[in-house]
Amino acid sequence: MAPGRRVERVAALIRKETSELLMHGIRDDRVHQGLISITQVDVSGDLQHCKIFVSVLADPEGRAQVMEGLQAASSFLRGELGRRLQMRRAPEVVFHLDRGLEKGASVLGLLGDLERERQERGEIPPGSDDAQNCHDDEPS
């Protein structure tokens, strides 16, 4: 098996097991103060380091507490991953906050605001598909 495929397979297994541990294995109350989604798992080629990117749905204070709880649980998580995946040496786990979903929601909110402003000015009729209207003038 190519080294890249093994790294991908280990990353997928780490994602699955970490998800299970977040739901049922970690007892730290800080971790359960928000909705956590694992967005990406990056494992180094030598399988010694693992970055787990998470999105946390909570207020800023709750998000900070969740991240503190995850960092505190990382050594427990490393041990559990080593045991569950039967790895001789489990990778060192570091959690990173992924703000991609947050930024996406912000962009969608801004686009919604822009559409409402355009409707108020009468530039586009309510409920119309602006993209479709742009192509109506083109010849077939």
From Swiss-Prot:
Subcellular location: Cytoplasm
Segments for region (Disordered): 116-140
Annotated Pfam families: RBFA (PF02033)
Signal peptide: none
Main location group: cytoplasm
The keyword Cytoplasm belongs to this UniProt entry's keyword annotation: yes
GO MF annotation: an example: ribosomal small subunit binding
Keyword Acetylation: no
Gene Ontology CC: one annotated term: cytosol
UniProt keyword list: Cytoplasm, Ribosome biogenesis
GO BP annotations listed: maturation of SSU-rRNA
InterPro entries, A to Z: KH_dom-like_a/b (IPR015946), RbfA (IPR000238), RbfA_dom_sf (IPR023799), Ribosome-bd_factorA_CS (IPR020053)
Subunit structure: Monomer. Binds 30S ribosomal subunits, but not 50S ribosomal subunits or 70S ribosomes.
Physiological role: One of several proteins that assist in the late maturation steps of the functional core of the 30S ribosomal subunit. Associates with free 30S ribosomal subunits (but not with 30S subunits that are part of 70S ribosomes or polysomes). Required for efficient processing of 16S rRNA. May interact with the 5'-terminal helix region of 16S rRNA.
Similarity comment text for this entry: Belongs to the RbfA family.
Protein name stated in the entry: Ribosome-binding factor A
Annotated organism of origin: Synechococcus sp. (strain WH7803)
Gene name in the database record: rbfA
